[in-house]
C-alpha cells in the first residue's frame, strides 16, 4: 500500500481539487519531497461512509503513509512526512517556525468583518508588515535561500488571502510590501504550488457562505 491523502473536493464539484489550505499544505510537502501519493477527493458536504470510518470527525486532510494508519491534522502529517522522507529537508529552525503564523486568523477576521473601524484591517497589516521585515532581513524565504515547512504552511493561506480579499473587498496587499510580493510570486510560481492549488472560482465559492453569514 502506498501513500494516500484525503483532501477537500471543490464545493459542488466532487471530482475537482478543493480550497482547503491545510490539505494543500500536505500536498505541497509531498510534491516538494517528490513522494508519490494517491489523492482522494472528499465531498465535505456529502462525506462517504468509508471516509468517516478513517476520520470520525469528518475532517480533512488525513494521511496514510502506507501502513494503513490514518493520521489527521496537517501539523502532525507534515511532521510525519518529514521524519519518513527526510530528503530534501524542509525543517524550519524553531526560531522561525512561527513567522507569519497569525496572518491567516487576521485575514479571516478582516474578511468576515462588516465594520471598517473594528481594527481588523490594521491587525492584518501589522502581521503582513512583520512578515515583510522578516523577509527583508532573512529572505527570500522564511529560512533564507531554501524553502521550508513554514513556507509551505503559509503559501496556501496567502493565496486565500490574496484571492478572497480582492474578490470580496477589493483589497490588495499594499505595494510597498515589496518583499511580501516577491515572496508570494516565488511561492505561487513553483511547480508544486501550481499543481496543488484550487482554482480561484472554487476558493471564492468556498468562502462565500462564511463572508455572507
From Swiss-Prot:
Keywords: Cytoplasm, Detoxification, Oxidoreductase, Stress response, Transferase. GO terms for molecular function: glutathione dehydrogenase (ascorbate) activity; glutathione transferase activity. Glutathione binds at residues 8, 19, 47, 60, 74, 160, 207. The active site is at 20 (nucleophile). It is found in: Cytoplasm, Cytosol. It holds the Pfam family GST_C_2. It catalyses: RX + glutathione = an S-substituted glutathione + a halide anion + H(+); L-dehydroascorbate + 2 glutathione = glutathione disulfide + L-ascorbate. One of its GO terms (cellular component) is cytosol. Disulfide bonds: none annotated. Monomer. This is Probable glutathione S-transferase DHAR1, cytosolic.
